[in-house]
Structure formats: C-alpha cells, structure tokens
Amino acid sequence: MLTLNTRINSADKVSAQLVLPYESRENSRLRTALSSGEEVAIFIPRGTVLRHNDLLMGDDGRVVQIVAARESTYRITCANPHDLLRCAFHLGNRHTQTQVGEGFLRIARDNVLKEMLEGLGATVIEEDAQFEPEAGAYGSGGHHHHGESSQGHAHGPLAPIPVHQKIHRPSDIPSR
C-alpha cells in the first residue's frame, strides 16, 4: 500500500489524484483509495488540513494531487454586504465551518442553520460543490510550543481556543 507522508509545493509530474470530502481532508491519518482504486494511507503531521490541489509525495516518490470532492452544501447570498456579514457572524457564533467567497458563504447542509439564515433574510440554495471552509484565526500558519510554558508569551489580540471548544458539524447532531 502506498503511504503518502510528505506535503510538497510543486512537482514535475503528478501520478494520481485523491478525491476527498472536507471532513476526510481534516484527518492526518487516513486509509482510502486513489481515483484509480489503489489503496493508500495518509500519514501527515497532526493538525494538517489538506486543500484542493495540495500535493503529497508517497514513500515510493510518486506525487498525488488532492482534489476536493463535490459535497452537499448550501450557498448563502444576501441582498447586501451588511446582511451577508450578519449571516457570517451568526454562523461563526455557532462555530460552523464556513467557506467565504466573493459575495457568498458556503456551509455543509444543515436544515436548522438554513432556517436561521432564511430568517435573517438570506437566500439559501442547495448545491453540490467543493467545500473549502476558512482555516480560522487559529488554523494553519500559526505556531506551537514544544514543552515550553506560554506564560509571558504574548499571542497578540487573539486568545487561545479553550481545550473544550466544540466545532459544529451537521454530523454532530444525532439522528432520530
């Protein structure tokens, strides 16, 4: 089985594609299959989120391109930027993973959130689309500490996320 364990910035040749929904692209340990059907294991640093067109190199030197799968989403638009900002605020207040586009927001389908957004005056359209939510203020690109105390270390205006913080996903709601 091919093991993909190194993220690279560019490659002369891409050997295969791996189509994954966002939820799978959040996993740093995953067993799945390439578009060709070949089984692969992803073993990358914890906390890494794979994005559309990312490249991973396998233990045999082959390069695999990540492709964001089309998923069941809602595309949210509003009559004006102020109303769209209000919708973004309420989604963020509920820790909902949200993709921010030019004049629209996109979230995974969730009927409760759809009703809330429509109540705020938004137009909510179901669509199958690639889902690329924002990494957030605490997402990749930040830094971490190896065993050192954070006392006396300023993080600027952003506070660390509490350990018990919950991110809302539609799959978190138990079915009846």
Swiss-Prot record:
Q: Which domain of life does the protein's organism represent?
A: Bacteria
Main localization is cytoplasm
A GO biological process of this protein is: urea metabolic process
Q: Which Pfam families match?
A: UreE_C (PF05194), UreE_N (PF02814)
Instruction: Quote the subcellular location field of this record.
Output: Cytoplasm
Write the record's keywords in alphabetical order, separated by commas. Chaperone, Cytoplasm, Nickel, Nickel insertion
The ranges of region (Disordered) come to 134-176
* Family annotation (SUPFAM superfamilies): Urease metallochaperone UreE, C-terminal domain, Urease metallochaperone UreE, N-terminal domain
| GO terms of molecular function | nickel cation binding; unfolded protein binding
Checking InterPro entries in the record gives: UreE (IPR012406), UreE_C_dom (IPR007864), UreE_N (IPR004029), UreE_N_sf (IPR036118)
What do the Gene Ontology cellular component annotations say?
cytoplasm
Q: Which NCBIfam families match?
A: PRK13261.1-1
Function comment: Involved in urease metallocenter assembly. Binds nickel. Probably functions as a nickel donor during metallocenter assembly.
Similarity section: Belongs to the UreE family.
- By what name is this protein known? Urease accessory protein UreE
This protein's gene is called ureE
